[in-house]
Amino acid sequence: MTIWIDAQLSPALALWIVQTFGIPAVALRDIGLRDGTDRQIFLAAKEQSTIVMTKDADFVRLLEDLGPPPQIIWITCGNTSNAHLKQLLGTALPRVLALLSDGESLVEVSDLRPKGEKR
């Protein structure tokens, strides 16, 4: 199980995931795919049977059109700080990984704070 971190997420998340959860993770820039199209990235991830962590809904559409693999972790919490995203993933990622291990192809991670609560 390897997680590819899409370009609109901080590449630092990859190292944090490795250090925090002991799961292989790599930023797309580090494997030469930072400037790839969504389709190119999706097909490369399909070939490698990886997990793509992304904020981009295009990956959800590609998954619907082309099927898994890859599996998708879809981050829908909007713009947020790296610190807040790490806090959110620190809580959610164990359950997300369990769902993926159980065969889910798409898991959405969102911030369910009440409106107006500060991040």
Q: Residues of each region from the PLM?
A:
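N-terminal first-folded block
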Residues: 2-50
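Small/polar loops that bind or transfer phosphate-bearing groups
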Residues: 5-6, 54-55, 77
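Ribonuclease/tRNase effector modules and their secretory precursors
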Residues: 1, 19, 91-95
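C-terminal structural segments of small proteins and small subunits
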Residues: 70-114
